Amino acid sequence: MLFAATSWWALGARLCLRFVERGVHAATLSPVGHPLRHVPGAGRAHTYRTLSSLESLEAALEAEQPALIVPCNDQVVFQLHNLYKRRPKWRPLIDASLGDPRAHEVVTRREKLLALAGEVGIPVPETAAVTSEDELATLFDRLGPEAVLKIDGSSAGEGVRIVGSLEEAVRAFRALSRPIGLGTAIKRAVINGDTLSLWEWRHAPPPAVTVQRFVTGHPANAMVACVRGRVVGAVCVEVLSSEGRTGAAVVVRVIDSPPMLEAARLLVERLGLTGFYGLDFVIDGATSVPTLLELNPRCTQLGHLSLPGQGDLGGLFVAEALGLPVGPPPPAIPRDVIGLFPQCVRLGQMDSNRSDIYYDVPSDHPALATELSKPAWPERRLLARLYHRLRAPEYVRMIDARPNKSAVGL
């Protein structure tokens, strides 16, 4: 296996550890200092290089000859799609890892994905591509008074704007539709440690902006493991608190949601998907019906969670995709409310006196836990610290994600 990541999230390391615990040889491809490099027992750590990122990916594939590759953020998926078009020799591996290549354009284009979801009977908000301010005005008149503007390929709440007026919508459209400039790409590479910023500057198409009808309710997420169009395991959660209004979940509750599972099954089957995928929903406040907002074409932060009666998605995927015996799953999480690590630490939400929340700390691997609790490697470097003294990063506040409800006392 080869785990590949460029975003500085912990989720790839947590999932990779599950594979290693099952006896799977898991090499990694990431920037220097990335959490994947701290997974105990992982194989060789290959370096994703800023000035030759696609070449780095191909070199790692040549060296490892993996049975499968697990992309841990959207940009790696985009590079795999690019490699699929350019280098036929890697197509069997990418097919085995991601599924039917005809799905590539659908899973990375929100409007197409939601249109297909609607065709198979999944509740979705009205969504339309927008290419001009005049078009936006017409669409907002129909979709407002509150709407959501998004760009394809964004994640963790970036590239998302919730707007309450046409004026706000126009400002958001201007910001989101502006292509990344060379100066911004260099800043992201040097300060933020974004390995693929220069590659995206050279190769990414102009930002694709969509406008979506706002759905009142509270967020929910699902992550699925699937093999050749069949779901082999899933985790569904409702989000109790998150990093801001559009950011990543911090505290979640595991739920049994047949409608969310059915939506995942329908999409996976229709698109012939393999690998790990995340689905974002809003549970309607009036009807309790989950409405699908988008699909993330890679693993999310739920993949390592071991649930009663199921185990973790990593183990289920290993057994089905590789045909390997995986043995008993890790101990199941003892409570349904989970404080996701390391977000709880970084946002100061760890409280050892709380018996109703299970804090998702990898206690069996203290060195990894210590590393993940630190700021991301780029933020620790002198240049980034000096930069942020001059331009302070935006403060992220944890919010209750459920309207008019207490997030288990948070």
Stretches found by the model and what they are:
Residues 130, 160-165, 225-227, 254:
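Short beta-strand-to-turn element immediately C-terminal to the catalytic PLP-Schiff-base lysine
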Residues 157, 239-252, 296-310:
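Glycine-rich phosphate/pyrophosphate-binding beta-alpha loops
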Residues 174, 178-242, 254-262, 283, ...:
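Phosphate-binding site of ATP-dependent enzymes
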Residues 245-250, 255-279:
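Oxyanion-binding "anion nests"
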Residues 269-304:
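Conserved metal-phosphate-binding beta-hairpin within the catalytic cores
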Residues 315-410:
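Peripheral (often C-terminal) accessory segments that flank ATP-dependent C-N-forming ligase machineries
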